[in-house]
């Protein structure tokens, strides 16, 4: 009997050895960073699992987009862009589910109330690369439900890009402040723009940073979405380190976690936050590689040397969008047995479910093709009809 899966929430704790010393990050130099093209920016860690996943993804290439979407939505109803009474898309649901499953709400409540029984103190959040604002929209609504009436949001996103600028109601809200950085572009690839956002929020009680940045990649290179997205992933992660107050939390969207850079970011996160999770929320399709890094209780930089190196790495390491630099020696991660066991377990669980889900689509696609053909024939006007009317389009398409 063939295996089946369904959309459901998964959550994984990522730890490092309790007795492990902090890695000597400040001793590293950015003068001679190793660079790899995004096609070659993987190593042999869990290579068999990654290649198995890629092989199944590649088999989908022959399935027409309409057939794939219809099959996916039939097998996995949560994949359809429904349940949108509160948010304009599913991104808000995924953020709130990730925060709920990893205890972020509880942590923020403790942080804001302390020992006081009075109303919680004010706090702010930053929405990085978040346009048009689904995350901010979700946070404002969740804040109202929890009685956080004085919540203030700050946002930075690319300027002048259709579909990415903030929702009009956010721009008009006195509770939301947007910036496009020092140069007015909102480009997070420029460290000066991140520093500008940090300067604007310096006096704010910044206890939450969320980051949903990414971009669509061509269908022919979807297997490399993780490494193609390396620069924006690192930039958002670095922004959180600059923006958060101690005790704050961070949520970042990721695509796969197989590459050495993703592994290094997870490892260093374990050094700078009390608790680190990877969440796969229920509304994040089981058929895709998306997941969320959730970091709880920011401890701060261990030293100024860490801050200088991580800044310099961003400016010097990413020479273009084609190459991925080496952040830390890979041995630093591999020699920590606790960390590697957690990462391998997480990758195995998410990728295995994804392979099963994609195989379910491959198996069901032929029947869906015939079903769609039959519907097309039914919609054609009878021979000799002269009413000139065009049948209405199918409903239920995925708007994302």
UniProtKB/Swiss-Prot annotation:
Residues 373-400 are annotated as: Disordered. It comes from the Eukaryota. The active site is at residue 253. Its EC number is 2.1.1.57. Residues 373-389 have a biased composition (Basic and acidic residues). Residues 86-299 form the RrmJ-type SAM-dependent 2'-O-MTase domain. Keywords: Methyltransferase, mRNA capping, mRNA processing, S-adenosyl-L-methionine, Transferase. GO terms for molecular function: mRNA (nucleoside-2'-O-)-methyltransferase activity. GO terms for biological process: 7-methylguanosine mRNA capping; methylation; mRNA modification; mRNA processing. It catalyses: a 5'-end (N(7)-methyl 5'-triphosphoguanosine)-ribonucleoside in mRNA + S-adenosyl-L-methionine = a 5'-end (N(7)-methyl 5'-triphosphoguanosine)-(2'-O-methyl-ribonucleoside) in mRNA + S-adenosyl-L-homocysteine + H(+). One of its GO terms (cellular component) is nucleus. S-adenosyl-L-methionine-dependent methyltransferase that mediates RNA cap1 2'-O-ribose methylation to the 5'-cap structure of RNAs. Methylates the ribose of the first nucleotide of a m(7)GpppG-capped mRNA to produce m(7)GpppNmp (cap1). This is Cap-specific mRNA (nucleoside-2'-O-)-methyltransferase 1.
């Amino acid at each position: 009997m063939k295996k089946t899966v369904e959309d459901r929430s998964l959550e994984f704790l990522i730890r490092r050895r309790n007795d492990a010393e902090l890695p000597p990050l400040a001793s590293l130099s950015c003068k001679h960073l190793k660079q790899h093209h995004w096609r070659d920016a993987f190593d042999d860690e869990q290579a068999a699992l990654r290649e198995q996943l890629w092989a199944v993804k590649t088999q989908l290439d022959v399935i027409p987009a309409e057939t794939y979407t219809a099959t996916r939505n039939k097998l996995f109803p949560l994949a359809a862009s429904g349940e949108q009474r509160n948010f304009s898309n599913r991104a808000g649901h995924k953020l709130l589910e990730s925060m709920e499953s990893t205890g972020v709400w509880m942590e923020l409540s403790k942080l804001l109330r302390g020992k006081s029984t009075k109303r919680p103190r004010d706090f702010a959040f930053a929405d990085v690369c978040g346009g048009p604002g689904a995350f901010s929209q979700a946070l404002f609504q969740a804040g109202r439900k929890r009685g956080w009436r004085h919540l203030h949001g700050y946002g930075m996103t690319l300027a002048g890009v259709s579909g990415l600028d903030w929702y009009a109601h956010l721009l008009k809200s006195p509770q939301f402040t947007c910036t496009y950085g020092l140069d007015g572009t909102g480009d997070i690839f420029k460290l000066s723009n991140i520093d500008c956002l940090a300067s604007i929020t310096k006096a704010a009680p910044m206890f939450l940073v969320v980051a949903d940045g990414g971009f669509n990649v061509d269908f022919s290179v979807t297997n490399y979405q993780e490494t193609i997205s390396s620069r924006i992933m690192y930039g958002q992660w670095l922004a959180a380190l600059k923006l958060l107050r101690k005790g704050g939390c961070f949520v970042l969207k990721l695509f796969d976690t197989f590459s050495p850079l993703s592994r290094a970011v997870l490892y260093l996160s374990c050094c700078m936050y009390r608790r680190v999770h990877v969440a796969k929320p229920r509304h994040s399709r089981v058929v895709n590689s998306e997941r969320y890094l959730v970091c709880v209780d920011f401890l701060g930089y261990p030293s100024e040397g860490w801050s200088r190196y991580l800044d310099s790495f961003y400016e010097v390491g990413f020479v273009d969008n084609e190459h991925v630099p080496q952040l830390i020696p890979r041995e630093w991660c591999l020699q920590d047995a606790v960390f590697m066991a957690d990462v391998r377990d997480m990758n195995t669980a998410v990728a295995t479910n994804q392979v099963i889900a994609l195989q379910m689509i491959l198996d069901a696609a032929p029947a869906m093709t015939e079903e769609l053909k039959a519907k097309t024939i039914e919609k054609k006007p009878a021979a000799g009809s002269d009413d000139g009317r065009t049948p209405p389009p199918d409903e239920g398409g995925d708007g994302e």
